[in-house]
């Protein structure tokens, strides 16, 4: 039995689909409080499967989490549940600390109480900060120091450190993966690629921060899910694994490509004031 938190979100739902197909004998339990970014209809293809269960609760609700663990006695817990939008974290950091750090602590306490084979924390390469644009030879590795830029990445880094502390202090069998920017089906349209596609299809302006020179390493979500599957089954306990796409592109080039593919004019592109503390480049060591 695997509990997948945040399974109604973008990456979590794709992971559930992957696991149901790759491991049809597994029982999958999705725990999700259905924030604005969660969509229950995404899970429609698996809702009626006998080996799937959906539970609408928050990972910050200790009683609800313990009740679920008592009922299901999971072997593996994979934590996707997170507030993940940098802009929202700049405006309202507190909810990020609550979900991303406190929620992680509640899950790990439940894992300690009920005993599990593996707890996996899904994290982000944003915990490493950013890289200079003029040094394309530099990449993030698992040894890169944590150097966060936003309240979002700080909350994820705090959770990662807590996970490693639970491993060292209590012997909890944990692994962590840090991924680059994901894209693919069921992506909530506040992030760059789905937002630009949705706006372009409706002939709305395509807002690009600053000059759009910021570089991101793009990872297809299904590739990410396969990597997590591998880590939870074969990864070494206590280790951090970076998962990258080796697919760097400037934001402006992504937007121009979307215009080209959709047959829309680049005149829709609108340059807006840059994000506060905007990271220049993310890239994971290939």
Predicted regions and their residues:
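Amphipathic alpha-helical recognition patches that constitute DNA-binding helices
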Residues: 10, 150, 191, 195, ...
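Conserved GTPase G-domain signal focused on the G5
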Residues: 186
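N-terminal Rossmann-like NAD(P)+-binding domain of SDR-like oxidoreductases, especially those catalyzing
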Residues: 1-182, 222
